[in-house]
Amino acid sequence: LHGMEKAKGKDYIKNWVAVIGDSTFLHTGVNSLMNMVYNQATGTVMILDNSTTGMTGHQQNPTTGKNLRGEPAGKVDLEALCRALGFNRVRVVDPYDLAAVETAVTEELAAKEPSIIISRRPCVMIKGTVHKPAIAINQDACKGCKACMQIGCPAISFKDKNCLLYTSPSPRD
């Protein structure tokens, strides 16, 4: 994001959001954010804080407050870290609150300075994660308006004037 802005200009990246996971951010992303502030970039970065290192098997990382053995350990505060790097615009959203996410992205893309959006929700693959109840589709109430399609859920589809919901067993079962 920052390199593209410097190479092509601010208008080129005005609607871009760089996305990085919490673990990868701590592994390789901190320096990039430092460079954004130092070089007066204007981009928006979204950190997906899911409280695990999903890409390698769901290990602990410095944002979880536990070490690799699951014992208590120091916890990196992502908001404080981003502010310490020089970001004035740091906000946290719940990715289940789509309206809040949309508002955050819209506002931060319009900002004239670099900004951070931390999307925080524990990974559904972590044991003990509290889940919202599963959704259901009431076919009798379906009007065929396709409003359900606007959330972008891959489990919801629309065929022959009917909203369909794909269900499968939970990977934790």
Q: What are the language-model segments listed below?
A:
Residues L1-I116, T129:
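Thiamine diphosphate
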Residues E71-G74, H131-A136, P169:
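Short, exposed beta-strand "edge-strand" segments with a Pro/Gly-rich flavor and a Y/T-containing core
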Residues E107-F158:
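Glycine/aspartate-rich loop-and-adjacent alpha/beta segment that forms the canonical ThDP
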Residues C163:
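Acidic, glycine-enriched active-site microenvironments
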Residues Y166-D173:
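Conserved small/polar residues in nucleotide/adenosyl-binding loops
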